[in-house]
């Protein structure tokens, strides 16, 4: 009997899929799985002059909602706090650094990828 991959392995697989997808759209990879006590950032990319903090969500089926619907307001707050911490940790001014929050929603084992730019409005 074959074991199902654990959640962490599955998460890494879809994060790498999202990373490759964004790279094909001319984004540059900066960092993956940045952790702090405020939360985690799945991917940090660069789109020209802007940093892009990417939340990757996967759903095998949309029976219980889409992947992007899983980014609750609580999760949004964690992402915002963690991104601000990352900027400060890297010596970047929040006021003078361009950044945004995107969501890459993956469905159907990667057959359907939905990239939502500016999915989370900071503030």
Curated annotation (Swiss-Prot):
Lineage: superkingdom: Bacteria
Pfam family, one: UPF0102
Family matches, as PANTHER family: UPF0102 PROTEIN YRAN (PTHR34039:SF1)
NCBIfam families: PRK12497.1-3, YraN family protein
Protein name: UPF0102 protein VSAL_I2655
InterPro entries: Restrct_endonuc-II-like, tRNA_endonuc-like_dom_sf, UPF0102_YraN-like
Molecular functions per Gene Ontology: nucleic acid binding
Membership in a protein family: Belongs to the UPF0102 family.
Organism: Aliivibrio salmonicida (strain LFI1238) (Vibrio salmonicida (strain LFI1238))
């Amino acid at each position: 009997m074959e074991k199902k991959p654990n959640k962490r392995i599955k998460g890494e697989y879809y994060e790498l899929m999202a990373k490759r997808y964004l790279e094909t759209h001319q984004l540059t990879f900066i960092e993956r799985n940045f952790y702090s006590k405020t939360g985690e950032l799945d991917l940090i990319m660069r789109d020209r002059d802007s940093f892009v903090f990417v939340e990757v969500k996967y759903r095998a089926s949309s029976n219980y909602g889409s992947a992007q619907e899983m980014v609750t307001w609580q999760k949004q707050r964690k992402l915002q706090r963690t991104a601000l911490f990352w900027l400060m940790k890297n010596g970047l001014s929040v006021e003078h650094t361009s950044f945004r929050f995107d969501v890459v929603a993956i469905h159907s084992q990667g057959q359907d990828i939905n990239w939502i730019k500016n999915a989370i409005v900071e503030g």
